[in-house]
Amino acid sequence: MNITIERTPVLILNAGEITLGIESRKTMENHDRVEENRNITKALCALMNSGEGKVKAHIKNPDYILSKHGIGEDLETSFKNILPSRPLDFKQYQSYFFICVEKSQSPDGSVGKPATIATNLYMRNGASSVEMNLEAAQEFLEKIKVAGGRSPSARPSDRPGDDTQEEGHVQELAAAFFKQSKLTKKEKFLFSESKNVEYKSFETKKLLQRVKEILPRTVSAFANTDGGYLFIGLDEKNQEIVGFEAKNCQPKCLESEIEKCIRQLPVTHFCEEKEKIKYKCKFIKVHDSGAVCAYVCALRVERFCCAVFAAEPESWHVKDGGVKRFTIEEWIEFLMS
């Protein structure tokens, strides 16, 4: 769905049609609900970054009343996540829905942070890859800028606690596993997932698709934290080696896609070296009854010198008569201005 700009004294972004109401949106097909949400959220994001005005959408359901039915839980969540501090005013005029946005300025006269749907900047939090919110992303990038980059390895604590020692032990076990050249089907492995270790089984014909889905955020998170290991072909539930069969995905094909994916990840530098993402990918043969039956894909990602994004930040503005996505350079400049 295209977003059009209406020629009026006030900036109006027309987001097309939308189904509104808490119950009505719950009964929608998931694909349609996501697409409508994405489109009107994109329009709102662009408007917030372009001053003031209105987002306009034609209401699909004819019996809708804003004061009675609400707008929809998914829309409320998405709108709040763009820029929580920005007040919004919802209005209905006949069969049209309006989101009114007033120009916002900080007390110091600056325009504040860019409204953003997704920073696409990840870090590790425990055993998970977590997207940074605007505040965390700003703090992370400013620290790197002040320091002129990040050291190749994290400085250890003077007195590491039990959690730090446990994570170090897990990483040592994962490093030893990474060095293996031969594995045995159904054999147990002795390390858990942690800040530096993640593993997946992906026993499916859609292995390549699943890897491509998780790889950007996992690599971004490891690179932006302290590096780490991703293993494909390990059963999370039973902590057993299962591997993946070559018929589901040839190792060379998977390796090529991993390389392509990592090289396409956006990065930003505040250092002089401007290095590329450092990683190593290998395939360990899995044996059963003496014969090779599957493979484990082992990926080691090094701590990055600056910042790695899973994708360009999803943030929009009105430019040259249309709704345009900020480049990563524009977004960072806006965020840190």
Residue ranges and their predicted role:
Residues M1-S337:
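Conserved N-terminal catalytic/coupling substructures associated with nucleotide/phosphate chemistry
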